[in-house]
Design a protein with these regions (language model features):
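Predominantly extracellular beta-rich ligand-binding scaffolds that present long acidic/polar faces
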Residues: 87-95, 99-105, 569-706
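Extracellular polysaccharide-degrading/modifying enzymes targeting complex plant/algal/animal polysaccharides
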Residues: 30, 34-398, 620-635, 651, ...
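Primary recognition of N-terminal secretory signal peptides and signal-anchoring hydrophobic helices
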Residues: 742-895
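Hydrophobic core
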Residues: 10-18
């Protein structure tokens, strides 16, 4: 129906208010500070005279706090659209804290696009074409004349070019203990002796017109393979003191860190060029696919086609393993490649387009996190994109109630967000992508006393992570601590694992995880391991883990949930696992696998219990020493929560022929293999292995063809497994899609915000008047009359002669008298309004519930101030849909 807005709107602007209601931000209890790239730090920070930098805004908040000028309900720092480059971190501490009643919020103003970056601008016009023959002759590609450019970074104000950071999980490995006589050589010592600092930030990266360029490497895509080996170097894992007594253990006196040497005859023509590459680095999966390591190049012999490293590989090397070489001028041969010469200060670049058309060049030189928060409370970051950082976008330490939401975090060289030693801190409703890692929650909560940290990652999409380190760098890592969570996230596209955890009472739930572990064997999508005592009470439940198959030759393959090396005390329940090799692998004590569905898993088993006792696995020192040191042994909280753990004795651990307390029951395997439970575990009366179905019959899904794995009420699975509990499959993953479906035919709003959703589309109640928003008067919600007409697709008109406003659709006509605000007529029948019309700021407001019900609509109200109006009764349930309501309310909220 065509909407009609007539002279009513002009008439309403002249009416006198009958109820004084405060609607401006300041009058509503909020103080607002404004920041703009076009501002000045000498300005007062008002809307018309904004500040220029985030640091100046922080200082303004400090001034207001000291003078008692913060808002009663909160203080908001509004960033206007643009990019804010940080030469130093935005550091917040205790003096920057808000309170529960009055938090401090840093936000993008009115959904404008705001970016924080840890980079500096390099003048595009400062680049000059390279004509020096001595440089061009170093390049493998002999046709680079007129294509290569360079800029002197020292002349651009860059004081120092840091030595490259060695990428890879094992590049700085602390490999040895202190048993025996002699010095202990560790990998970190070897590379630091060459000037590679393990504590340094990652290498600076180059962005041209907001796109990431790539350090010169060979090959440009894919990998080379180790062809022949002339010196494998030591297997340094055998230097670790956790295998003292083993025949493999190497005593300190015998530890010789010999670099490795291999042949590369297939690329013999290139090797002569590499002789001048004095800053080149080789990356490889030198022995195991999960053990990535970068090593400096030491020597190239073109005659013998031998390549020698400067330090050993952590695990020696073997043939056919993947490697490549990077950080060398000689291999610039593709548009977008660059090389920073640490010695001369020149940045060499092969542009992707005409150099004269380039508008911006940014080099990430900030040696720190973009936002650093220590010992602070009640701070929010909302709607701000953060990235291009050599470390993290956000680093939180010893914080409480710090929340990051609605952010786009990208191109960090470390974890996107680090949360350490904190409580009630969250990352929500955000997109984290093209980062080295996602979110690390470390030591949050009191593990010794089982007090939950309640820090979490929720409703985020995390993809294309581990872009630099490749392995053991996760989308979410719940490390140590107690009681933290990762839920309702969508995680995809990575070479190795998605989620790691250690510690008790962690929850990994309702996540949709796919297309990870793409280039690693013996890897887990959700992985943890090697602890008897510290992980009890953690749960992996109601996740959809699917379509993760490695692109490498594998011995074991990819495992959906991998409880490695006698990890104990974890529950895995209610998961749907599809198109994997193995659904699960475990050993340990008191692990529970129940109520899971496995679909099209290709290995010879879906769940494997791979070892029965610690001695057989050769892990006795590590596991038993860790068990002895566990803090739970002297703590009543642990004794009460986990009596089975408390009952374990050292005699059990050393002499048990089988681990106990395990449950594998009530699982359904469809078009997959069976259950490979080691016989001693299966036969033990102290383990429960039963009611596990293998079937080629559809379990009874609502729509298996379209992967809707919700179970029908009469599903076959309930006949085969009467105790099987329905898995809430439609609640898995991010809220966004489900929320959009839920509100696709509804009007959704929240108190004190000008934003609304109308049939799923976000808009403002009045684009030209931000102050128009739902307000509460005498416990009734009021909204502008004009908005009601527009939102419900009705005609709105005004009769000058009768001074009546009208809202009408095909079935209902409502007439309001502007001379009697307490009455309304519906289809000619006069009715009294319990709450009369109000005039606020020259606009007529109507009681939302009354008018909605007169239009035969249903109104849902949540105590948070969230309101939904639709044709559906009980469109939401405050308890069951609490997280979705919070998500939608956050999308609408001004503060």
């Amino acid at each position: 129906m065509k909407r009609k807005i007539t002279a009513l709107m002009l008439a309403l602007t002249t009416l006198t208010s009958v109820s004084a209601v405060n609607v401006s931000a300041a009058e509503n209890g909020y103080v607002e500070i404004f920041v703009s790239p076009a501002g000045s730090d000498d300005n007062p920070g008002t809307a018309d005279k904004p500040l220029k930098t985030a640091i100046a805004a922080r200082n303004k908040v400090r001034e207001l706090k000291k003078s008692g000028g913060l808002g009663e309900k909160g203080t908001v720092v509004n960033f206007r659209e643009g990019t804010y480059a940080f030469s130093e971190a935005l550091s917040l501490n205790e003096e920057d804290s808000g309170t529960e009643e009055s938090p401090i919020t840093y936000r993008a103003y009115l959904d404008e696009e705001v970016s924080f970056i840890g980079g500096v601008d390099i003048t595009p016009s400062a680049f000059e074409e390279v004509k020096d023959e001595s440089i061009l002759n170093r390049l493998v590609d002999r046709n680079m004349q007129g294509k290569l450019y360079r800029v002197n970074l020292f002349k651009e104000g860059v004081k120092e070019i840091p030595k490259p950071y060695l990428l890879g999980t094992y590049s700085y490995w602390q490999v040895a203990g202190t048993q025996g006589e002699g010095d202990c050589v560790i990998m970190a010592d070897l590379v630091e002796a060459l000037g590679y600092d393990r504590k340094a930030a990652k290498s600076p990266e180059l962005f041209v017109d907001d796109e990431l360029m790539e350090v010169a490497k060979y090959p440009n895509s894919g990998y080379l393979s180790i062809e022949g080996i002339t010196e494998p170097g030591p297997f340094m894992r055998n230097w670790n003191d956790d295998i003292v007594g083993s025949s493999d253990w190497v005593a300190p006196a015998d530890r010789i860190p010999t670099p490795f040497r291999f042949t590369a005859k297939s690329i013999s023509e290139r090797l002569k060029y590499w002789q001048t590459a004095d800053q080149a680095i080789m990356w490889g999966r030198w022995y195991y696919d999960w053990a990535t390591q970068s090593v400096p190049l030491a020597k190239v012999n073109p005659e013998s086609c031998e390549i020698t490293s400067a330090v050993p590989s952590a695990f020696s090397i073997r043939t056919n393993q993947a490697w490549y070489i990077y950080n060398l001028l000689e291999e610039i041969d593709e548009p977008g490649e660059y090389f920073m010469d640490q010695k001369t200060g020149y940045l060499y670049y092969y542009p992707t387009k005409d150099m004269s058309s380039i508008k911006s060049v940014v080099l990430t030189l900030l040696d720190g996190n973009v936002v650093d928060i220590h010992n602070a409370k009640y701070i929010n970051f909302k709607g701000i994109d953060v990235g291009r950082s050599r470390r993290s976008a956000f680093n939180l330490e010893n914080c409480e109630n710090v929340h990051i939401s609605d952010a786009d975090i990208s191109y960090t060289a470390s974890m996107a967000v680090k949360i350490y030693n904190s409580t009630n801190c969250t990352v929500k409703d955000s997109h984290i992508h093209d980062v080295d890692g996602g979110v690390e929650i470390n030591n949050c909560g009191d593990r010794a006393n089982l007090i939950r940290g309640n820090c979490g990652v929720e409703n985020c999409e995390i993809d294309n992570f581990a872009r630099l380190t490749k392995t053991y760098t996760t989308a979410v890592n719940l490390s140590n601590g107690c009681g933290n969570y990762a839920r309702n996230n969508e995680i995809h596209n990575a070479q190795h694992m998605a989620v790691g955890f250690s510690g008790p009472y962690h929850e990994i739930s309702f996540n949709n995880i796919y297309n990870v572990c793409q280039e690693a064997d013996d890897s887990g999508v959700i992985y943890t391991g090697r602890s008897l005592a510290t992980h009890w009470g953690s749960v992996v439940k109601n996740n959809y883990i699917h379509d993760c198959t490695p692109n490498v030759t594998f011995r074991i393959g990819t495992i959906a949930v991998y409880l490695d090396d006698f990890l104990s005390g974890v529950t895995v329940a209610g998961n749907v696992i599809e198109n994997m090799q193995l659904a699960g692998m475990f050993s340990g004590y008191n692990n529970i696998w129940t109520n899971n569905i496995f679909i099209n898993c290709t290995s010879n088993s879906v769940v494997t219990a791979f070892s029965a006792n610690i001695s057989a696995a050769g892990l006795r020192p590590t596991l038993i020493d860790g068990w002895k040191a566990a803090t739970y042994k002297t703590n009543d909280a642990w004794k009460t929560a986990f009596p089975a753990l408390y009952a374990l004795t050292e005699d059990n651990l050393k002499n048990d022929i089988v681990t106990t307390g395990n449950v594998v029951a009530n699982n359904y395997s469809w078009n997959s293999s069976g259950y490979d439970i080691i016989e001693t575990m299966r036969q033990s009366p102290d383990n429960v292995i039963k009611d596990n179905v293998e079937s080629v019959r559809d379990p009874g899904f609502v729509d298996a063809e379209n992967k809707v794995y919700l179970l029908k009420e009469n599903a076959q699975i309930f006949k085969d497994l009467p105790d099987f509990k329905p898995i809430p499959f439609t609640r898995i993953g991010r809220y966004e899609k489900r929320a959009q479906e839920r509100i696709s035919k509804a009007v959704v709003m929240t108190i004190a915000s000008p934003y609304v959703f109308v049939d799923g589309e976000k808009k403002m109640i009045n684009d030209s008047e931000q102050e128009q928003m739902p307000v509460i008067i005498n416990n009734s919600t009021y909204v502008p009359l004009r908005f009601v007409g527009e939102a419900f697709d009705a005609d709105v008109s005004f009769d000058d002669a009768t001074r009546q406003a009208q809202i009408s659709n095909d079935e209902i006509t409502l007439n309001f008298s502007l001379d009697d605000l307490a009455k309304v007529s519906k289809n000619g029948e006069e009715k009294a309004l319990e709450n009369p019309l109000r005039v606020i700021g020259g606009r007529t407001y109507v009681p939302l519930r009354a008018v909605s019900e007169l239009l035969d609509k249903e109104v849902f109200w949540d105590d948070s101030g969230f309101i939904a109006v639709s044709d559906t009764e009980n469109l939401f349930n405050s308890e069951a849909d609490g997280s979705m309501i919070d998500y939608l309310r956050n999308k609408l909220s001004m503060y």
